[in-house]
A protein has these predicted regions:
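Extracellular disulfide-bonded cysteine-rich modules/repeats
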Residues: 77-79
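Flexible, glycine/small-residue-enriched loop-and-beta-strand segment within the central core
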Residues: 1-56, 67, 72-74, 83-84, ...
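Charged, low-complexity C-terminal accessory regions
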Residues: 96-101
């Protein structure tokens, strides 16, 4: 697992690099091997999000609340939400400083 600099993780986030159990084929060989997870710099993983094996999240991204993201590469500067996870906005930025207008 690789996590970039200045990331923000809300509560109840789960990051998994494996299924935590084995699934075997008819010959007794494991078919669900673990895979790396990579999270870029300045990425915000919101409350209840699940980041599963084989996922690469780019830099400056937001993964929405309760989103399950599995085995995809998001690219940079995107908002990813819903299940199954999909990019819904591109060319985004975020700040942990509250802006009052």
């Amino acid at each position: 697992m690789k996590i970039g600099k200045k990331c923000l993780f809300s509560s109840d986030v789960i990051i998994r690099t494996s299924d935590a159990h084995s699934i075997l084929n008819g010959e007794g060989k494991r078919i669900n091997k673990g895979c790396n997870v990579t999270i870029g710099d300045h990425t915000w993983i919101c409350n209840g999000a699940r980041v599963m094996k084989g996922t690469t999240i780019g830099s400056n991204c937001v993964i929405g609340s309760n989103t399950m993201i599995a085995g995809i590469n998001t690219g940079d500067n995107v908002l990813v939400v819903v299940n199954p996870a999909r990019v819904v906005k591109t060319d985004i930025n975020w700040s942990n400083i509250r802006i009052i207008e």
